[in-house]
C-alpha cells in the first residue's frame, strides 16, 4: 500500500515545526527519514499514525486521507512503533502482542486459532518465542522494544511506521531487526539516526532539516559528503561497504565540517588566542 504525504504542515503551540513536506513511499518500499535532532522526523511520522493532525496538507494511505478513516480502518492499514512507548503494562508479553489483533475483533470477541498463530509468528520473528509468560514491565528496554515491534507485526498492517526502531537494541538485535524488516516486504516508513543502518536498509531516504525536506532519493545519491557537511555538520567520506556493497559513511571525528557549530567555535577560540 502506497503512502503519499502532500504539502504537510504541522504547528505545535503556535509554532510551525514542519512545512511543505511532500514525499512518497511506494508499495513494498522501505523509506527512511533522516536528519538532525529537531528536524521534524517524528512529527511527520506522527501524522501518519494519527498522533498529530496536520495544520495543512494531507497524508494518504492507499489513496485514502488517513484522517477520513475510522480508528479501526486506520489500524488495519497502519501499525506504528512510536517513541511514546508504554513501559508500565502489567501484562504478559503475549498479552501485549495479542493487542495487535484488536482491530480485527468485534467487542468481547475471543482469540481464535488464526490470531494465536499470528501472535506466535510475531514473537518468533523478534526472537521472543520463549518469553510469552514474562511480565512486560520487568523487561529491559531492548526487550520491550522487540515486544512492541511484535505487537505491530501482529496487527498485520499494510504499512509499518517506526520511529527509531533500533533504539535500545544491541548490535545483534539491530542486525536481526533490519533483516526482519527487509523480509517483510511491507511498505515501511521509519526514522533512523544511524545513517549507515539507513543506507543499508532503505530503498529511499528523505532528508529533513529545520522542518523542511531538503533531499530525497536512493541512499547512494542522497548521502553525499556535501550533504553530510551541510545538514549534519560532519566531515565524512562515503565508500562501499566491503561485505554488502552498500554505501558506508566513514566519519572524521577529529575534523569538524566547515561552518559546523564545532568548527565555528574552534575558529573563534583560535582567533581569540
Residue ranges and their predicted role:
Residues 57-65, 74:
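Conserved ABC transporter NBD signature motif
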Residues 154-158:
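A short, proline-enriched helix->beta-strand linker immediately N-terminal to the Walker B motif
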